[in-house]
């Protein structure tokens, strides 16, 4: 089957399966001073494929500087 990101067809998003807190994560890159995303509303999006996985977001003033993790 296809992954949630493949189903969503998000351009510019890279999915990186990992074991960080037993959750997968994805990275979305945008231009400087840009913004990504919007509020997720159940009446506008099919969230049934998420199962028990939580939605998480970053973007508050206290979270503007995020650490960069690289793995090779």
From Swiss-Prot:
Optimum pH is 8.3. High activity between pH 7.5 and 8.6, rapidly loses activity below pH 7.0. Loss of activity below pH 6.3 is irreversible. Optimum temperature is 52 degrees Celsius. InterPro entries: Alkaline_phosphatase_core_sf. It catalyses: phosphonoacetate + H2O = acetate + phosphate + H(+). Keywords: Hydrolase. The keyword Hydrolase applies. This is Phosphonoacetate hydrolase. It comes from Penicillium oxalicum.
